[in-house]
Design a protein with these regions (language model features):
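Residues forming the flavin
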Residues: 1-209
Length: 209
């Protein structure tokens, strides 16, 4: 199994400011902050000044379901649920009130009891789900706060300010997979996944593999 790797948002630096602003994190980096074995031993602070955040935004489908900017048109299938989980854990770790907003095209909760988990986050934990398209992300002031401008579901342009922005990065096939497939004589599709048939989803183009 060739495994997977997460999408590198630095490819879209002009839009996300991932490299230039320390308060823009990938989902994996944010999970390290929440971890007891992480750099802050589980204490929720933002990287730029080590202050506790009051507002955190998650941006879904970074590197997935996007053929205009990154070319990955598929859903990675894990990003929605790990964003919900991280938002709930962040609220548990916060010493004060913490506003968590997940900006999304839609929430895909297709696994067993995933919908219940989503509703628990929304109705009991107070996680806010905003169905919207992100227009721009800007750094505001010397303290490196972030302004998100977005189009809401009514088609109106809104803007909000956040202490941390978490990029829910999708998964993609490692570059080394192409060489492996060539050696095995297995055909790949345009996303470098093994090419299969609709009624034989685990059979490759090479018999017996």
């Amino acid at each position: 199994c060739p495994g997977s790797e997460h999408y590198d948002p630095s490819e879209l630096e002009a839009f996300y400011h991932y490299k230039s602003n320390p308060n823009v994190l990938t989902s994996l980096e944010f999970e390290r902050i929440l971890s007891a074995s992480g750099p802050t031993m589980g204490h929720l602070v933002r990287p730029s000044d080590e202050k506790e955040p009051k507002k955190i935004a998650w941006l879904q489908c970074v590197g997935s379901r996007d053929t205009n900017r990154c070319g990955n048109g598929y859903c990675s299938s894990v990003c929605c649920m790990y964003a919900i989980k991280d938002a709930m854990i962040a609220k548990e770790h916060a010493e004060g009130d913490l506003e968590c907003t997940i900006f999304n095209m839609d929430i895909r909760t297709f696994g067993k009891d995933y919908e219940k988990y989503y509703l628990r986050a929304k109705e009991k934990a107070g996680v806010r789900f905003e169905k919207a398209r992100i227009h721009t992300i800007d750094e505001v002031g010397k303290n490196k706060d972030l302004r998100i401008r977005y189009m809401d579901r009514n088609g109106e342009l809104q803007e909000e300010f956040y202490d941390i922005v978490v990029l829910s990065v999708g998964l993609q096939v490692p570059a080394s997979t192409a060489e492996l497939a060539k050696r095995l004589d297995v055909d790949l599709d345009k996303y470098n996944f093994a090419m299969t048939q609709p009624f034989a989803p685990v059979e490759t183009t090479r018999p017996g593999v």
